[in-house]
């Protein structure tokens, strides 16, 4: 028992060294189900659907480690001036028909030129540090061929970082370390955030590129420039392609590359198997050195306006898997203002 407690403490030190105040690996939260809400990583997705798309997410990471990351968010985005609500390639013309089947999508046409606006609210807590981000996004969509559309988007917002010294277990740490401030209570600092992205999409594929934290900044809890945490730009590259196994079953493999200078590229891969517009299952794998992990996912659409999905993540590293516990993530979606004859037009 003592050895297990000791090992858990060692694992905790390793984890928080990677994601703590002076770390750069998790300045942005990680999401297992990003492929279901690409908007969270790329503002160019803003307003891509035929309705207002609202998502709620809760992620509990490494459940056996006290103070491990807990992330929740709300996103909402929708189109402005989109005139093809009843004529999109996946519009449901026959009640009960499958809007995702291959024969329906054969007549796919790109979206008409339109705008999109959105809002993002993210809460991320790790140990004695919590971050709250509020962002507003805008995107413009236009067809570039008879089957393909391109969108460009921007996001601007503010992040509040709160350090609660009362929750710090000091141990060998120095309470007078200026990197974590001198106040005995809570310290809050704010900084602006900006991001930009491009999104190329059709009935079969999507390719996206985005940069979040596009303007590097330094978070300081004291005035001395020597101390503080540098916030680096995060580059994301995403791509996916859908194949039809049958008229009602499709498979969507996708991949995301994440680059945070000076760290190596992180690779996130997923595959999603969907039956009609009813339910889906999926799996993923993250290559991230000692934090690599495998993910199992499943989701269901309930009616035309509500959907829910769940993912379970397990570390590949045996010691991390044993002592850190699993990671759970729930995503709930609401399609607001969606007409009875309109279904999601995009492959995710």
Give residue spans per PLM region.
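Sec-dependent N-terminal signal peptides
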Residues: 5-19
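Sec/Tat signal peptide C-region and signal peptidase I cleavage site
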Residues: 21-25
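Subset of outer-membrane beta-barrel
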Residues: 26-348
């Amino acid at each position: 028992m003592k050895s297990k407690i000791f090992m858990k403490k060692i694992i905790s030190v390793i984890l928080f060294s990677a994601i703590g105040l002076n770390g750069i690996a998790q300045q942005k939260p990680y999401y297992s189900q990003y492929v279901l809400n690409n908007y969270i990583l790329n503002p160019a997705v803003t307003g891509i659907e035929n309705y207002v798309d609202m998502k709620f997410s809760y992620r509990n990471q490494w459940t056996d480690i006290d103070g491990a990351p807990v992330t929740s968010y709300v996103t909402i985005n929708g189109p402005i001036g989109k005139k093809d609500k009843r004529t999109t390639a996946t519009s449901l013309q026959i009640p009960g028909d499958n809007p995702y089947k291959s024969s329906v999508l054969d007549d796919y046409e790109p979206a008409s030129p339109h705008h999109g606006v959105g809002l993002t609210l993210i809460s991320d807590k790790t140990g004695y540090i919590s971050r709250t981000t509020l962002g507003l996004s805008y995107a413009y969509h236009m067809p570039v061929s008879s089957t393909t559309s391109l969108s460009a988007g921007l996001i601007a917002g503010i992040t509040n970082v709160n350090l609660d010294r009362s929750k710090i277990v000091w141990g060998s740490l120095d309470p007078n370390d200026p990197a974590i401030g001198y106040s005995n209570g809570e310290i809050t600092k704010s900084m602006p955030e900006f991001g930009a992205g491009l999104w190329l999409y059709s009935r079969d594929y999507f390719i996206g590129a985005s940069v979040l934290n596009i303007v590097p900044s330094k978070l300081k809890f004291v005035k001395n420039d020597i101390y503080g945490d540098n916030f680096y730009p995060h580059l994301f590259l995403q791509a996916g392609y859908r194949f039809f196994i049958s008229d009602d079953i499709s498979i969507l493999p996708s991949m995301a590359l994440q680059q945070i200078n000076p760290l190596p590229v992180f690779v996130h891969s997923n595959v999603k198997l969907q039956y009609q517009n009813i339910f889906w299952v999926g799996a993923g794998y993250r290559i991230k050195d000692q934090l690599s992990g495998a993910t199992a996912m499943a989701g269901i659409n309930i009616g035309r306006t509500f959907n829910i999905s769940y993912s379970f993540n397990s570390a590949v590293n045996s010691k991390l898997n044993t002592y850190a516990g699993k990671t759970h993530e729930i995503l709930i979606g609401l399609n607001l203002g969606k007409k009875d004859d309109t279904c999601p037009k995009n492959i995710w």
